[in-house]
Amino acid sequence: MTGRIFTADHHVYDLPPLLSWNVRHTGTVPCDSWSVTAVYQPEMLTVLRMAAGFAAIENGMTQLRGIVDEYTVELGSRGMTVTLSGRGYAARLLDNESRPVTYEQVTLRELIRCHAEPYGISCGAAADLRPTVPYTAGAGISQWKVISEFCRTYGGFLPRFAKTGELLATPEQDSGKRIILDSGSPVLNCRIREDHYGVLTEARVIDKRQNVSYSVKNPEMIAKGGQCRRVIYTPGRSTWDAMRYTGEYQIQQSKKEEQAVTVTLPGSFGAFPGDRVTVRLEKLGLTGNYRVAETENRFSAREGAVMIWTLKECG
């Protein structure tokens, strides 16, 4: 893999051959992250001090665009090395707060123009969301929160980032691509985890102004003996639909980390968040269709190139 640096004064610099690297894709928040280590050369110092952007390039294809958060020069057992690390482009929106603002009527495109484009974010696709009610961005929230809450409330989805750094503000689509994992796949490690901690059995939504409440339950977790209730207060004049949606959303959010399959394979960049995987690992009792939620691609002289996929069951 090639690590390419973009400086604040618009110069491009390719790092020396990498000794090790790690690229993690989530597609959303927590945002993508990366780190690379290379042999340090004294002439690099000027570049490092101005390093602002990063691209991970594998076989001529960009696998990640991000920002540079830090660099470290070290004299150790491997000689003089430099390690750089940073995050994906979602960091540009997470690191910047919005001023308080209320839009009487606003489209998603207009929201992106005001809250994403000023921070160097280009939009690859945006849903045609045009709510007829006011939308308020409160004080102290990030630009990411402004856009993601709008998409969640009026579109029922969360925006994400392509590996090239473009914002994708549309519902995720199934590309039709299928990855097969079966007994013939070169699986180095596979782990199944189920964690009930924090999974809600009930979400009670209360509108204090109207003195009404709505309860949404999670029968699957109740059947497993779970007992975890949350009470959520909403702004006044909430509709029954809005209250039900809020309760269902809280339960779905609590279930996101309940089950996960982690698979380690040789190679790099074989999957990306959103890809679909058909699993047929009968020895583990593991079969079904899964969505790639997160990937980690790493390389070192000791273990070579490996990729770790975190899979979640397709809903």
Regions found by a protein language model. Give the residues of each.
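Short beta-strand-centered interaction patches in the first periplasmic/extracellular domains
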Residues: G79-T81, R87-A90, A125-G198
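Acidic, small/polar-enriched beta strand-loop surface segments
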Residues: M1-R4, N59, S148, K163, ...
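Envelope-exposed proteins and targeting segments
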Residues: D32, L64, M80-V82, K163-E166, ...
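Assembly/oligomerization scaffold segments
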Residues: M1-E97, K177-R193
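Short, surface-exposed secondary-structure edge patches
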Residues: P42-L48, A126, P266-G270
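Short intrinsically disordered coil segments
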Residues: M50-G53, R99-Q105, S183-N189, E220-M221, ...
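Amphipathic, non-transmembrane alpha-helical segments in extracytoplasmic/periplasmic proteins
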Residues: V36, G86, P100-C123, G138-A162, ...
